[in-house]
Amino acid sequence: MKEYKVWAYARSAASNLPALENQLAEVMREADRRGYIIVNSCMEQKYGTEFWRPDLFAMLTAVQQGRVNAVMVQSLDRLSHDITILYRILRFLQNYGVALITTETNLQYELYLTGLESRILARTARTGKRVPWEVAVDAD
């Protein structure tokens, strides 16, 4: 099993700070349960349609610098609600060989529903880079 160095990320546009803190805590608990190394974490109260988010860019910088090899979120929409932004983030993760891991949803199914799975798979075939998601296999 691959050793993941994870950046735990939480985002919500709602002004309910305890709910956002709980979202991040749940992601971190799941990372710990799976035996991942939590390198850093962040949470931000921003809209999912915004691309220029300070904590998102801090996480992407960590990816670029090789400090993490996985990003862990509750679900795909925690990264963005905008398909174009999601595709940019996924391409970025793929370029750096970083896995995206979700804790509460089937990421591959979410990508299929948004139409992004086929785009990423086509890009994978063209570039030879691995897919930027992790298919979790639970022993439970």
Where are these regions (language model features)?
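Short, structured surface patches at the beginning of a domain
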Residues: 1-140
